[in-house]
């Protein structure tokens, strides 16, 4: 028996990819043969970690398919042909309308993804939802199979590694309040709402404050430009976009943060909330989607 994990894209530092890799280690420790196949493989992923989905050979009826579902994918369209035991881990799919004005490709793939999820309702044996919110989504889309909630697997030992000294040195112990949000620059994350709240705080409460919006804007350049225009229109200073950075730098930004401010409108889980809790950073968040479930009573909603 082989346990195959399938996903559309395995990326460096992505929550779905990290969950896949963490589960891979658990499966190996249990003594099972296992392999990861993805349609797209980030060049930064160590060679041999995953194989291209097109190279997936014959799957035996005694094997197990675990499909990490988070976007539109050929895997969804092929799913019915696998005659083995099948499990879907549902990470949720961002509503496509968020991307309509910013990236036509993203809009199409997320729209297709929603349609594909519904088509899989009667084609899987079992589902794992990474949040109660995701479980409710699956039920609403017609899934009647057993569904359990299992949060994303997070390798907490990685967060005990040494943070980037340059970031620590530059932004700590200077009397300024550091406001942080981490997550890709994307419309559903509502970075404009974070900026607006920060601008009010900086103007009326504490001029010695700065905002870090950590995350990649790849594919969302139009949205990023709109955020810059919004910052200029508000006349607010000290809004910093570090971009897609190294892991030790992410650790450092959590170390120097005084508060984590999340205004996201759609999250299937939201790993950064757990990261902020790991570093004991106070959290203020908008009560949407899976946010409250992930916080579990922590933070201010």
Model-derived features: positions:
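Conserved donor-binding/catalytic core segment of Leloir-type glycosyltransferases
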Residues: 128, 170-189, 195-198, 212
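Aromatic "clamp/platform" in nucleotide-sugar-dependent glycosyltransferases that forms part
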Residues: 265
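Short hydrophobic beta-strand element within catalytic cores of glycosyltransferases
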Residues: 282-285
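Short alpha-helical donor nucleotide-sugar binding micro-motif in glycosyltransferases
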Residues: 252-257
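Donor nucleotide-sugar binding/catalytic pocket of nucleotide-sugar-dependent glycosyltransferases
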Residues: 122-164
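Glycosyltransferase donor-sugar binding loop
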Residues: 39-42, 210-225, 243
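Nucleotide-activated donor-binding/catalytic signature segment of Leloir-type glycosyltransferases, i.e.
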Residues: 224-248
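Membrane-proximal helix-turn-helix segments that form the acceptor-binding/catalytic region
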Residues: 106-126
């Amino acid at each position: 028996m082989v346990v195959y994990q399938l996903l559309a894209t395995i990326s460096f530092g992505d929550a779905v990819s990290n969950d896949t890799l963490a589960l891979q280690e658990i499966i190996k420790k249990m003594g099972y043969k296992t392999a990861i196949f993805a349609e797209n493989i980030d060049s930064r992923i160590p060679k041999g970690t995953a194989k291209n989905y097109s190279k997936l050979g014959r799957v035996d009826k005694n094997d197990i398919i675990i499909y990490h579902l988070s976007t539109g994918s050929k895997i969804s369209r092929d799913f019915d042909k696998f005659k083995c035991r099948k499990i879907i881990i549902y990470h949720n799919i961002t509503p496509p309308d968020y991307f309509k004005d910013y990236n036509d490709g993203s809009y199409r793939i997320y729209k297709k993804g929603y349609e594909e999820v519904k088509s899989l309702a009667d084609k899987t044996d079992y589902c794992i939802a990474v949040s109660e919110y995701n479980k409710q989504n699956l039920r609403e889309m017609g899934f009647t199979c057993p569904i359990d909630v299992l949060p994303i697997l997070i390798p907490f030992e990685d967060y005990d590694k040494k943070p980037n000294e340059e970031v620590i040195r530059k932004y700590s112990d200077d009397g300024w309040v550091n406001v942080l949000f981490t997550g890709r620059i994307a419309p559903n994350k509502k970075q404009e709402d974070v900026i607006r709240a920060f601008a009010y705080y900086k103007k009326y409460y504490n001029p010695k404050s700065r905002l870090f919006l950590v995350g990649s804007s790849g594919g969302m350049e139009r949205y990023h430009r709109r955020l810059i225009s919004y910052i200029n229109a508000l006349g607010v200073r000290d809004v910093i976009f570090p971009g897609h950075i190294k892991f030790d730098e992410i650790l450092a930004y959590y170390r120097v943060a005084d508060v984590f401010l999340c205004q996201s409108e759609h999250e299937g889980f939201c790993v950064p909330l757990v990261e902020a809790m790991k570093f004991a950073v106070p959290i203020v968040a908008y009560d949407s989607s899976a946010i409250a479930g992930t916080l579990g009573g922590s933070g201010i909603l």
